[in-house]
Amino acid sequence: MKRLYCLLFMLLVLARINAGTPVKILAIGNSFSEDAVEQNLHELATAKGIETVIGNMYIPGCPLELHAKNMRTGARAYRYRKIDAFGNRVQVDSMSLSKALADEDWDYISLQQASQLSGLYDTYQPYLHALIAYIRVHVPTKAKIVFHQTWAYAQNSKRAGYENYGKNQMKMYRAIVRASGQAMRTEPIALLIPSGTAIQNARTSSYGDTMNRDGFHLDLLYGRYTAACTWFAVLFRRKVEGNPYAPKGMTPQQVQISQWAADAAARHPYEVTEIKL
């Protein structure tokens, strides 16, 4: 029944795309959602004739526990960054979750765990469950909950929390895969956006372990582009390969690697696919 419901919803989203109605996406996250959706996603969609409205509720390093606390208290704790259908960007400071949820008729609302906790499912609950229940009360039932699977750190990262995974990139990646899979099995989440797998796929290519600018945030060019390509492939149910948009400074081979890594992650979100470029 859940699969049928999700299929019907996707048909409605495709109908909105075909009708020229903006697809509205809200991320409740932190700097990792900033890396993924605040650049490139709007442009990738525009290149294929898809209008979008994209919002990001941003607190640096925010875990699910703090999001849930802000939900309970109504804290005006967020920077709300929004990209409208024309690509105009605005930021509203001191925003609450309830106001952001009411700001648009959202199609997708994403949740994610803070990066250092992303492979530790015990830290997800009861906060993930409470947030989903809250969203269901405050937005129309048509809005779909999606979960953003974030990425493992660079192998040589000095980021606090990396010791949770023995300072081992593949151990962290596998833990993230397990935790995100458990979230998908136990909660009414419609879609997984496997940015973590896309980044790990890209690391098998000639990029190597260069996907991060500081050991944990994404490279500003091809790192962020790879994540945005993954969101595009999953949300719009189409390959990103061949999309003509890429940010200035990327070579044709880099564009191909990022697009292939994203498409492979959309097909196989819980396993690494080697990219031979």
Q: Could you tell me what each predicted segment is?
A:
Residues 22-24, 53:
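Residues that mark the start of a beta-strand
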Residues 17-19:
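Boundary at the C-terminal end of the N-terminal hydrophobic targeting segment
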Residues 211, 215-218, 222-224, 228-277:
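Conserved catalytic region of serine esterases and O-acyltransferases that act on ester linkages
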Residues 25-29:
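Short, hydrophobic/glycine-enriched beta-strand segments
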Residues 31, 35, 43-48, 112, ...:
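Structured segments of extracytoplasmic/periplasmic soluble domains
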Residues 35-124, 141:
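Conserved SGNH/GDSL esterase-like catalytic core that processes O-acyl groups on lipids
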Residues 4-13:
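Sec-dependent N-terminal signal peptides
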Residues 94-220, 233:
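Alpha-helical cap/lid subdomain in secreted, periplasmic
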